[in-house]
Design a protein with these regions (language model features):
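P-loop NTPase nucleotide-binding/switch module
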Residues: 1-29, 89-92, 144, 174-176, ...
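Conserved G1/Walker A P-loop phosphate-binding module
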Residues: 1-119, 351-353, 397-398
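Conserved GTPase G-domain signal focused on the G5
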Residues: 40-41, 155-165, 188, 192, ...
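Signal for well-folded cores of large energy- and translation-related assemblies
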Residues: 49, 53, 68, 72, ...
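Conserved nucleotide-binding/hydrolysis micro-motifs of P-loop NTPases
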Residues: 60-62, 84-87, 121-125, 152-157, ...
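Conserved C-terminal guanine-recognition region of P-loop GTPase G domains, centered on the G4
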Residues: 71-78, 99-265, 338-343
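Short, structured loop/turn "capping" segments at alpha-beta junctions
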Residues: 176-181, 292-298, 325-331
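P-loop NTP-binding site
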Residues: 299-400
């Protein structure tokens, strides 16, 4: 089980300052998770950590600064760099984002041993290509091994789309081998037998352009997830097949204008939005990629954030969830009280300052329902992080 986060800043600071309790043969891996805003980076970070310490919401730019999560398992330490979504200066200005939000993903890449590129396949608008910002990031650091993670595959009704997406997002090349989609009609697509990744001659793309596809499980290490198509009575069995490709040996900066995908991914993983099973497969893979080296953190550390930062972020997550449009972005949070109660419970009082009376009414809600719900849900999340009772009181006032 992951350790709880300390409730006092002093205790957390002490843990962060502590010399790591190095095992005999320590191994370490620093992982940058990058992707478009709202791709699910923080959700994945939380799943890998086994405890929710990063804020998550449906709105973009929930993560405002880079924070580190720490997974310590036996002699291995994974350091997860949870970063804001990669965006451009124009969009940053529109969302009133600080300059650090443009800089942080790039800074994370500088310190990473491996990069996970997360793509939300349920988003029709963004799933067919990697954003220019992501491609720019990858081409700037071609020496860092990268892995493609397709997220929310369970929300995709037509599974054959995954094959097209994989081909587009990898430019048809994974781990130096050319991917090919091979289709054969079969009467029973519900078969659970695993089909290995095979090396075969690539067929011309025009031949298979109009054939129906349906994805069966390919090599487990390559995909990290199986997909069930038992609903099709007569479906096509399709395998991703790899052959040696004359792909670029060194992926340096290049003309990104016409690129939609990245031909230097080492692996592909497919994850369901809320299921832990595939995340465990990914976690095992990451633990195997760790290299000998000293731990950065004591094994009692779960995150580099202070308890107050975690609290602010979790309350902010709820504001983003329950307030419309731009309203949550204008709320200023001020912690009035943070202390231990007589029975060891954590007592928190936070002021939420808003610029307009209309915003105040929305935040309080009819009969105080909205603010009560925010306090209740945020309080529960904080209990799960700190593993102690939390009494959270939220007050709403106008900015003076």
């Amino acid at each position: 089980h992951p350790p709880p986060v300390a409730t006092s800043k002093e205790e957390q600071d002490r843990l962060l300052r502590d010399q790591p309790d190095q095992p005999q043969n320590p191994k370490v891996l620093r992982i940058a998770i990058i992707g478009a805003p709202n791709a699910g980076k923080s959700t994945l970070s939380n799943q890998l950590l086994g405890r929710k310490v990063f804020p998550v919401s449906q709105k973009v730019h929930t993560t405002r600064c880079k924070a580190r999560g720490v997974v310590t398992y036996e002699d291995t330490q994974l350091i997860i760099l949870d970063t804001p979504g990669l965006t451009n200066p124009l969009k940053a200005k529109r969302h009133k984002l600080k300059e650090a939000m443009l800089r942080d993903p790039w800074d994370s890449m500088k310190h990473a041993d491996l990069v996970l590129v997360l793509v939300d396949v349920s988003d029709h608008w963004t799933r067919n290509s990697l954003s220019k910002e992501v491609l720019k990031c990858l081409s700037e650091f071609p020496q860092i091994p990268s892995v493609l993670v397709l997220n929310k595959v369970d929300l995709l009704k037509k599974k054959y789309i995954l094959l097209e997406l994989v081909t587009e997002l990898t430019e048809g090349i994974v781990n130096g081998k050319k991917l090919e989609v091979r289709t054969a009609l079969t009467h029973n697509s519900g078969s659970s037998s695993k089909s290995p990744l095979q090396v075969t001659r690539a067929s011309p793309p025009e031949k298979r352009a109009h054939e129906p596809h349906c994805l069966q499980e390919t090599d487990q290490a390559q995909q990290g997830s199986s997909l069930d198509n038992s609903s099709d009575t007569r479906a096509s069995e399709t395998r991703l097949v790899a052959e040696e490709a004359q792909g670029p040996k060194h992926c340096g900066p290049r003309d990104l204008k016409n690129m939609k995908g990245w031909p230097c991914f080492q692996e592909i993983f497919m994850l369901a939005a809320l299921h832990g099973e595939e995340v465990d497969t990914l976690k095992r893979y990451l633990l195997m990629q760790a290299k000998p080296g000293p731990w950065e953190f004591h094994s009692g550390v779960l995150t580099s954030q202070s308890p107050q930062e975690i609290c602010d972020n979790i309350i902010r997550e709820k504001l983003l969830e329950y307030l419309p449009l731009e309203v949550p972005y204008g709320v200023i949070q001020v912690t009035e009280m943070w202390e231990e109660g007589p029975s060891g419970e954590l007592l928190i009082v936070q002021n939420l300052r808003v610029p307009r009376k209309s915003h105040m009414m929305m935040l309080i809600g009819r009969g105080g329902k909205v603010i009560s719900r925010i306090a209740q849900e945020a309080g529960q999340d904080l209990m799960n992080v700190f593993l102690c009772d939390v009494r959270l009181k939220l007050k709403v006032e106008m900015k003076s």
